[in-house]
């Protein structure tokens, strides 16, 4: 692969992930997975592990930073757990793609996710989560919410003195434990009355509560503000209510940046639930619509691979009788399918027949 060059964000049609799929059966084997140092000893006990892709390599992400990611990076997340009433370990492995991650990083993260599954004897349910479109399962891993900062991890989280600090605007949105904290451009167009924002000016911190914001967003922002003050010592903070402050306030006059077209939630509420049979037997990706609307487990055939797309999640169901290559290519199939839809960034969940997936069962029943 060529060197890492920052590409146009989420330019899925130019991504080479589709090509990555055709090579998986040949190159992702248990033997090669055993040679990856990052996988040594993983999946042997219940818990969460996270890695970041750095120069095509899998590097361990510090546990203290779990739940904090950079939009310029790609990560792999492994959750090891036990199903109720069972002793054997079960696995969900995700790769998370930042909005400014490169195409190369995207492909390496996808490839290594499949390799990790091979290391775990193909026992994992595979997921793709894109920034701004994370699944509820992904968000559930982080009790303190998900924090997404601009740039890459080489910038560090807490290594800048307050007097040298570059102003930033943090957006708090969500409910209960599913609060997402995201750094957004310093521009007034980013403000939303139903959310909470923190303006970080280094020694001065403002919490802006939108008129329609909820108590969970306000509480999370307050906690975040307290942590920033504790880190910086001399910093002062003030809480502002949208309906009570004038546009001449420093909070507003500090928002002088330009807006960017960052990815938003792409859930397609108008989408019709669709079941497709997929294959690459002819040497290229091919999908055939089997059914739309009401879909049942009886519509699935264990000899094939199917995609179930309901507009909010793209499920890949792999039958036990599918070929080895088809079993490996689930993520590539889903990527190729989603490229052609209005919702290319929705979560992907790939699992095999017999693996427990409450999300898939719920999608069938809906």
Curated annotation (Swiss-Prot):
Gelsolin-like repeats lie at residues 55-139, 177-252, 286-327. GO terms for biological process: actin filament capping; actin polymerization or depolymerization. The lineage of its organism: Eukaryota, Metazoa, Spiralia, Lophotrochozoa, Annelida. SMART domains: GEL (SM00262). PANTHER family: SEVERIN (PTHR11977:SF130), VILLIN (PTHR11977). Keywords: Actin capping, Actin-binding, Calcium, Cytoplasm, Cytoskeleton, Repeat. GO terms for molecular function: actin filament binding. Its main location: cytoplasm. Residues 100-116 are annotated as: Actin binding. Calcium-regulated protein that binds to the plus (or barbed) ends of actin monomers or filaments, preventing monomer exchange (end-blocking or capping). Can promote the assembly of monomers into filaments (nucleation) as well as sever existing filaments. InterPro entries: ADF-H/Gelsolin-like_dom_sf, Gelsolin-like_dom, Gelsolin-like_dom_sf, Villin/Gelsolin. Belongs to the villin/gelsolin family. Pfam families: Gelsolin. It is found in: Cytoplasm, Cytoskeleton. Residues 104-107 are annotated as: Actin-actin interfilament contact point. Expressed in circular and longitudinal muscle, pseudohearts, pharynx and gizzard. Not expressed in seminal vesicles. It comes from Lumbricus terrestris. The keyword Cytoplasm applies. This is Gelsolin-like protein 2. It comes from the Eukaryota. One of its GO terms (cellular component) is cytoplasm. Interacts with actin monomers and filaments.
């Amino acid at each position: 692969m060529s060197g890492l060059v920052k590409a146009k964000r989420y330019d899925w049609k130019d991504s080479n992930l589709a090509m990555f799929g055709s090579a998986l059966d040949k190159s992702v084997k248990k033997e090669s997975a055993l040679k990856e140092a990052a996988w040594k000893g993983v999946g042997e006990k219940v818990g969460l592990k996270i890695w970041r892709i750095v120069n095509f390599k899998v590097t361990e992400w510090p546990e203290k930073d779990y739940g904090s990611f950079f939009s310029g990076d790609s990560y792999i997340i492994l959750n090891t757990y036990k199903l109720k009433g069972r002793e054997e370990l079960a696995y969900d492995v995700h790769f998370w793609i930042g909005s400014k991650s490169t195409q190369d990083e995207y492909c390496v993260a996808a490839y290594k996710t499949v390799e990790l599954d091979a290391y775990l004897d193909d026992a994992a349910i595979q997921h793709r989560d894109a920034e701004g479109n994370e699944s509820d399962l992904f968000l559930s891993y982080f009790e303190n919410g998900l924090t997404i900062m601009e740039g890459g991890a080489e910038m560090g989280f807490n290594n800048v003195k307050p007097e040298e600090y570059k102003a930033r605007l943090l957006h708090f949105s969500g409910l209960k434990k599913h609060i997402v904290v995201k750094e957004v451009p310093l521009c007034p167009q980013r403000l939303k009355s139903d959310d909470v924002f923190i303006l970080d000016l280094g020694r001065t911190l403002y919490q802006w509560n939108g008129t329609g914001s909820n108590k969970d967003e306000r509480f999370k922002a307050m906690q975040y503000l307290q942590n920033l003050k504790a880190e910086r010592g001399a910093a002062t903070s003030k809480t502002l209510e949208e309906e009570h402050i004038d546009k001449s306030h420093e909070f507003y006059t500090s928002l002088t940046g330009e807006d960017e077209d960052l990815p938003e939630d792409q859930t397609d509420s108008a989408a019709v639930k669709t079941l497709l049979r997929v294959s690459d037997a002819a040497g290229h990706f091919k999908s055939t619509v089997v059914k739309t609307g009401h879909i049942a487990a009886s519509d699935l055939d264990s000899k094939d691979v199917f995609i179930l797309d309901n507009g909010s999640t793209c499920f890949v169901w792999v039958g036990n009788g599918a070929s080895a290559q088809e079993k490996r290519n689930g993520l590539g199939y889903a990527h190729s399918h989603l490229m052609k839809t209005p919702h290319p960034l929705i979560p992907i969940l790939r699992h095999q027949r017999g693996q427990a997936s409450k999300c898939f069962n719920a999608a069938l029943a809906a």
